Amino acid sequence: MHDIEYIRQNSEEFEKAMESRGMKEFSAEEILKVDHKKRLLTTKLQDLNRQRNEITKKIKELKMSKSPCEKQIKSSKNITNEIEAISLKEQMEKDKLVNILSNLPNIPVQGVPIGAGENSNLEVRRYREKRQFDFVPKSHYELGERLGLMDFEQAAKISGSRFAILKGQLAKLGRALINFMLEMHVNEFGYTEVYHPVLVKNEAMYNVGQLPKFSDDSYLTTDELRLIPTGEVVLTNSVADKIVEEKKLPIRFTAYSECFRKEAGSAGQSTRGMIRQHQFGKVELVSITTEDQSNDELERMTGVAEEILKRLELPYRVILLCSGDMGFAAQKTYDIEVWLPEQNRYREISSCSNCGNFQARRMNAKYSLEANKKVKKYVHTLNGSALAIGRTIIAVMENYQNPDGSITIPNVLQKYISNGTVISK
């Protein structure tokens, strides 16, 4: 949610920011008109309430002196009726303003490349040389099906398209990755592990910017609960409607979450197998910070996600997203892309974003200053995948495959799989 005062004072700058987010020929005029109308009604209400209070005081004085007060009582009733009518109009304008602002994305911070799509993204760094194969590398789905450990056909019979069943050593590999990631985040980087619901209210989705704009992308149950598209929804909402002491920030949470999205993706090689699923597992990171901490926290969070790939010895690159390619709530985002040999390209495996106070305004999350506890400011929120489990499985399978179709288990994971070293038939 945007600060209306900022829009009043910086309408042209705000328009440019929205245009950089892909809203062509955006104008702040409608926002300012609705805001002006609402403010006039608010001023009128304040004046009427003042008049009614004065009349009420006068009525009390007249009654105490046993003087006639019918005229004042009638006047008070008329003002009350007028207040009720104007209050309804004011609420309508408030709702209209909130609806407009709720559908507008966050403003990019300085340093974010301005552009419409991925061609304007900026590569920041790379890690590790790509493995040179002396055979033609196979895809993860070909490897998995040949091993008899990955079943898309039966999953489709049970649940439809875009689902997968993993069995045996591949299922263990997924569990090993979850344990490895969570233990690293908790034991080495100070995150608090959270076990949380996967069904949430619409309000929780609204707070993080998933609603109203992306309503059709999530699964809605018959009792108006939604399956989470990311663990960020629950972890970020942990501070909704709260005031946190500044000295307790930053707060860092991590959780393994089953996530659900309706996206079907486009047909073709890039979406075959487990690349884009309706249900997928993800280890999430969320940080709640002061406004002064969030920039450094984004760098730290991205570094934590990178550390997983470094320990798995997987080639990757870090991309700074341009203004038109960022998520709705983000003001700055780094994507981490892992190398997939069979596809001969990098694919996203993590996205780490600083949302500033955008989500905090929607969910009314603040912190009290240590120097003056009466002063409250909106917290800053950050979120990142560290990492998407399915895509990490894919990356391990494709980068660690052997000529016979077996898969070498990365050293760092072997202790989680009974010291196994190879996945084979």
From Swiss-Prot:
One of its GO terms (biological process) is selenocysteine biosynthetic process. ATP binds at residues 261-263, 348-351. Signal peptide: none annotated. The keyword Cytoplasm applies. It is found in: Cytoplasm. One of its GO terms (cellular component) is cytoplasm. Keywords: Aminoacyl-tRNA synthetase, ATP-binding, Cytoplasm, Ligase, Nucleotide-binding, Protein biosynthesis. L-serine binds at residues 230-232, 284, 385. Pathway: Aminoacyl-tRNA biosynthesis; selenocysteinyl-tRNA(Sec) biosynthesis; L-seryl-tRNA(Sec) from L-serine and tRNA(Sec): step 1/1. Pfam families: Seryl_tRNA_N (PF02403), tRNA-synt_2b (PF00587). Gene3D superfamilies: Bira Bifunctional Protein, Domain 2, Serine-tRNA synthetase, tRNA binding domain. It catalyses: tRNA(Ser) + L-serine + ATP = L-seryl-tRNA(Ser) + AMP + diphosphate + H(+); tRNA(Sec) + L-serine + ATP = L-seryl-tRNA(Sec) + AMP + diphosphate + H(+). The keyword Coiled coil does not apply. CDD domains: SerRS_core (cd00770). Its EC number is 6.1.1.11. GO terms for molecular function: ATP binding; serine-tRNA ligase activity. Transmembrane segments: none annotated. InterPro entries: aa-tRNA-synt_IIb (IPR002314), aa-tRNA-synth_II (IPR006195), aa-tRNA-synth_II/BPL/LPL (IPR045864), Ser-tRNA-ligase_type_1 (IPR002317), Ser-tRNA-synth_1_N (IPR015866), SerRS_1_N_sf (IPR042103), SerRS_core (IPR033729), tRNA-bd_arm (IPR010978). Catalyzes the attachment of serine to tRNA(Ser). Is also able to aminoacylate tRNA(Sec) with serine, to form the misacylated tRNA L-seryl-tRNA(Sec), which will be further converted into selenocysteinyl-tRNA(Sec). Homodimer. The tRNA molecule binds across the dimer. Belongs to the class-II aminoacyl-tRNA synthetase family. Type-1 seryl-tRNA synthetase subfamily. NCBIfam families: serS. This is Serine--tRNA ligase. It comes from Wolbachia sp. subsp. Brugia malayi (strain TRS).
